[in-house]
Structure formats: structure tokens, C-alpha cells
Amino acid sequence: MTFYNHKAIEPKWQAFWADNHTFKTGTDASKPKFYALDMFPYPSGAGLHVGHPEGYTATDILSRFKRAQGYNVLHPMGWDAFGLPAEQYAMDTGNDPAEFTAENIANFKRQINALGFSYDWDREINTTDPSYYKWTQWIFTKLYEKGLAYEAEVPVNWVEELGTAIANEEVLPDGTSERGGYPVVRKPMRQWMLKITAYAERLLADLEEVDWPESIKDMQRNWIGKSTGANVTFKVKDTDKDFTVFTTRPDTLFGATYAVLAPEHALVDSITTAEQAQAVAEYKRQASLKSDLARTDLAKEKTGVWTGAYAINPVNGKEMPIWIADYVLASYGTGAIMAVPAHDERDWAFAKQFNLEIIPVLEGGNVDEAAYTEDGIHINSDFLDGLDKACAIAKMVAWLEETGVGHEKVSYRLRDWLFSRQRYWGEPIPIIHWEDGTSTAVPEQDLPLVLPVTKDIRPSGTGESPLANLTDWLEVTREDGVKGRRETNTMPQWAGSSWYYLRYIDPHNDEQLADKDLLKQWLPVDIYIGGAEHAVLHLLYARFWHKVLYDLGVVPTKEPFQKLFNQGMILGTSYRDHRGALVATDKVDKRDGSFFHMETGEELEQAPAKMSKSLKNVVNPDDVVEQYGADTLRVYEMFMGPLDASIAWSEEGLEGARKFLDRVYRLITTKEIVAENSGALDKAYHETVKAVTEQIEGMKFNTAIAQLMIFVNAANKEDELYVAYAKGFVQLLAPFAPHLGEELWQILTASGQSISYVAWPTHDDSKLVENDVEIVVQIKGKVKAKLVVAKDLSREELEKVALAHDKIQAEIAGKEVAKVIVVPNKLVNIVVK
């Protein structure tokens, strides 16, 4: 039996593509454009795993398909190479993180090339390259000039073990850091912030303009968290002080019986009575040790301390005790809430715990037993009594504005973006702080501000980055003799990934971020594929920067990514014992189709789980390419199921994909290829062209491959294969299995040219119709024969064909035919005497 040799074919075509610059981005302005973007990887020491190629194969299929359809295709790859692991490695080994990063990139690139992706490597970018981060820094200076980058003393999520502050999004629900699982404490520090809140409304509204999964849009909407309500001002009794509360339910103000301030609220110390001072100070200390997520966990026990002070409810003049509690965050809203315990579960639980008054102001429920959180007619509310929610809110807002104690307000959950990191391995922030108290951005002609090479990258110990140790780099003097100090914080890893898709468009431009005409030609990105784990942060940050650049006139579109697709996760095989505990694969024995724990002998249950080093179920693509070939890996990952589904890896599935490709190879190399078309495969071929084209467009790659299999089965039943159909089929296969596609194309054409730019096959609708039909011939209602006849044969012709059939002749010999009933395209029934 014939098999193809992937170890010979694949390197041969990879070398051909590289030598001939086959995938150089097209620049013919008369052609339509297609920009296919992958979420570029962080080049870790572990290298590529089989999850990476799933998304990469999808964009590659689309890119190859669009090239064949006559598009200019931009399909680039690069490296998101700043990041903590490289710095941690450098601290552990004393090596330069740049060396570690370069080695990892070389390994990633080798692995990616072995999989036959059609990247234009002339456009490769690396976020740690000064010629790249010059423009990351340039964008920062523009943010600074527009007042969108500012310094603030803010409580940050400080991780002692990492020596840095991390963003809220990087804190896990258990209050530890996403990276390393270390404890997170709140600590006030000078930080750079980006004013993403200034773009909240546009970030929300423009989600309507992009073709993204609704689930991802919803995650962004919830993160932005728009709510409409009112700001209400409460005076503090017996003082000239007041505080403001934002509420979405100003109509429940008559039910507000106490107020709660965040422990960090600026008023707390000045209103706390002497009797309560010690308890308040201790509570503030404890709150500072908790992350925002831990503090706002709905399930946690409510804690709080009374300040000894009272607020005055503006609608009824009642005194409301002012408490502090850690579930109120200084960074959210105004850092103060009015509590309406009758109609809010958290306020109700707090009021019950501390024996505070509960006044119902909406009809319905029993507030002695639980908070009533449904809508209802207003009661105990003076001028709002008898009104429904909408009318009551409108009337209360009008009253607040007339009396000068409040006004309508739109609020967002979105916070400004904490942009500094106290680490070495990141882009230096291009700001100089002068001894006269002013700060200035490094001028454009002095960019990039290059990260200095140093052996000493331990944290400085002062909360500043290791750059604070490098005096020569740190200290500067202005022309007028004024001394200054460079900013020591570096940018987060998100910085370089917030605009990289723009640099691919013009990666070697020294004069500007990218040429205006080229940006106009290529934007927006037509398809962006990557993991759903970046649903909020990366995509929100990139959209924010893009909108700033749009306002600056740098980019021509409001949104960067027209269509977004999240591939599913490839799960590993795992085994669980009777307790549900996972057992590493090297501790499992397979016997007669069952699985047993090698040490305990217990029978185990097999189930998919996320691939992890600890379970020893990570599959390395190098091993798959070695054994089965890159084309097999590509076809298998696309055939596993829908692209967005999470599916378990299976060795059997891999073998099935390889067998299919071997059958394709045998079909083209051993079947007689002929110049004359017998017509036998017309329908199968044209159906395949139509279906595969539509399914690639719709990213239904698994059904496209299934259709290719149907054609192979049909072709194998015939003695010969029409050359045009053989070529067309190989073209349809090539985006999925490009090495085999090229090899078979040369066998069929001997052209010496790549298949990549050969025009994509088209189908003929007239060939999709069946020309023949099968009819049954009955005698007295019993089936005696089945005939294949031309479609739409007349009744007379059908009767003639049926009566002339050998089997029927034998059945009716010596009998009189009384009647023949004909149903065209279906049956002939002969009645005999």
C-alpha cells in the first residue's frame, strides 16, 4: 500500500516557500485586501503546545483561501516578549532576560515553521525590540500630552514576592496573584494611570459596530458596567462636612437608614469620634491587607465598625449612623453608599448583624425575614407614595435637583488602567521628573528610551523598579542645569500588545508608527483569532488605544478588529480516582480497555481536563510532526469538531487524519488521471467545491474536511479521475494540508510553481442536479426490479424501459398485461392477469 513520506515532503516545501518568499504580502492596489491576525504568543521556555496551532491553522486556512481568491493577504506573526517569566528566569540564573527571550523566540519560530503556516516573516515584530517599543513609548507620550496618562497615589495590589503591583484583573478570586499564586495586599503607591474611563461610553457604544461573539461583547459591557442613577449629598451632623453617594435607586431614599464609607475614604479620620478611633484604626489596618475581590465577595461574612458620626438624610432629616465596611471600595463610585436594608440583600444582612433600622419603602415581601428586591408601589415615602419605580425615580431626581442636594448621574464600573510595574523587563516609561517639581515627556527625537542592560535586576527594595539602582541611566541634567530623574516604573506587558496589529502594516518605518495610506489600505483587521481568556483586558485595552489614535488622526477606523473568533481549548486525557482526584498519566496502566492506578490498583475513570505539566498530559507538537507530519496535525485539529468547542485530544483521531491523507495521496498517485470527463463525478465534485468554499468562509472547517472525505470516497469508486477534478480537489485540500497540496499539485501539473496563487476553483450549479434517478418496478405491488433511468423520462418511455427489462420479461412471460401505472421519477406498477 502507498503512503506519503511527510519527513521528505514537508521540509522540502517549507524550504521552497522560504526561498521564494511565497507568502510576501501582496501590494497590488487593484486587489481587495484581507488581514488575518493571530493573537501573538508570549515566547515561553516551554515552547509551543498543541493548543497554539488550532487558532493559527484557522487563520492560515483563511489566508491561503483568500490568496487563491485573488486577495492581497496580510498574515503576520510576532512576539509579545516582555513579561515576568523572563525576568524571574534572569533573577534565578543571573542571565540577561533578552538572551532567554531570544532563545525562546528561535524555538517558537522553528516549531511554527514546521507546521507550514503561511506567515510573511518580513513583517515579524518583537515587543522588546527598541525599534518597536520606540512607538509604544511614542503612544505613551501622546496619552500624556492629552491628559490621558497621569500620576496618582493609589492603593495598589502589591505582591511582595513579585516585587510589583498588579492590576485588579490579575488578582484571583481567592485574593492571590494570577502569576505565582502569591498573597496580594493593598498598599498606597505613586503609580501611572491611563484614563480609559474617558472612553467608557465609546467603548460601550462601538461594540455594536463589530462582528464579535455576543458572549464577549457582554463580558466587555459588564466590565464597563454603565448604570444611570443620581448623586446624592449627605451632610455630616454637627459639622460642615458632607459626602456624596451614587445610587441607581434614588427613589428608595426614604428607606436609607445608615451610610457606609470605604475604610480608605478621605472623611473617615475627620468624622470618627474619640470613643471609636481605636476600633476604626484597627479595622482600616485589616482592610488594607485584603484585595478588592476578597472584600467584595458576596458570600463572605459582613464586617464593619461605626465611626460614631451621623449623616442627615436630606429627604426626611433623619439621623443615619455612618459606618465603615470593607465591602465598599474607595475606587468604586464615590467610595460611599447609602444603605436601604429593606430592599438590598447585602445591606439587609449588615443591618441584621449590627441591629440597624430597616424601613420598607416598596410594597411587597416581609422585610423582617428577608430583603424585598422586586419592584413595587412606593410606601412610607411621602411625596412618592403610590408611584411605580420609573415615575418615582424621575420625581426624586427632580426634587434632588430643585433642592440642590443631588443630580442625575451616569456611572461606570470601569476603573482607570493601572499602567506601571515595578519591574525591569518592560518598556521604560519616557518621563523625566525634574528637581523643580515639574515632569516632562522625553521628546520624540530622543525615542526610543532604551532599556539599559544590567546584571542587577533584583527589585530595588524601595518599591521602585530595579532601574532605580542604575544611577548613570537614572540621573539626567537639562541644558539649563536643572537636574532630573528618569521614571523608574516600566510599562505592563499589555502595552506592546495594545497596538502590535498596526505595526505589522508597516514594520520597518523609522519615521512614524505606520504610513497613513497603508493603515487606510489594511484596517480594520478582517479576522482576529485567539483564546477567550483575552475577552476583556487585551481587547478592551487595544480598543482604547485605537480610539485615542483615531482621535489623533493616526488611524482611519474607530475599531481595530472587525471580526473576532475565539477557538476552543484542546483538552488532555486525564484520569480520576473514586474521590475525583486527578492522577498523572505516568501512574496509569491500561488493561483491556480499562484504566488502573499503578500503585493502588484502583480502577480509574477517564475524562478530559486542561493539559498541564503536573498531569503529564501535555502534547508537544514536535512529537506529532515527527510521527504523523504537520499536515496530519493541522487536519486533525480542524476536524476534531467546531472551532469554538473545547475537545479532548485523541491519538485515534490523529491516526484517522493521517489515514485520510494517505488515501488522498493514493488517489492522486495511483488512480488513472484522464483528460476526458466521463461525467460520473460531476455532481460529487461540484458539490464539494461549493460546500468547501462556503464552509471555509463560515469557518466550519470540520464540515469542509468531511466534504473532502466524501469526494475521496466517490472518486475511489471510479476507475479513472478527470484531471480537472483532480486538480480542483487538490486546491481545496491545500489550505488544510499545504505540504501535501503542493506535492500533489506538482505531480499533476509539473509546473514548478506554488499552488498558493492558482485561482480558487468554482462550481457549476447545473452540475449539482442529479441527471439520473432510481425507479422501482413492481408487479401487483411487489418490487421486482430497480432501474437507473434518465431524470424526467416520459410515462411512455418509462413504461417501455420497464417492460423491456430482462427480469420483468421473465416475470410476465405468458401473462396478459392488464394495466401499467407510471409515477414519473418514482415507480412503474404492472398489473397482470
Swiss-Prot record:
First and last residue of the signal peptide: none
Keywords: Aminoacyl-tRNA synthetase, ATP-binding, Cytoplasm, Ligase, Nucleotide-binding, Protein biosynthesis
GO CC terms of this entry: cytosol
Motif ('KMSKS' region): 610-614
Localization in the cell: Cytoplasm
Pfam families linked to this entry: Anticodon_1, tRNA-synt_1, tRNA-synt_1_2, tRNA-synt_1g
Similarity field: Belongs to the class-I aminoacyl-tRNA synthetase family.
Protein name: Leucine--tRNA ligase
Species of the source: Streptococcus equi subsp. equi (strain 4047)
Gene: leuS
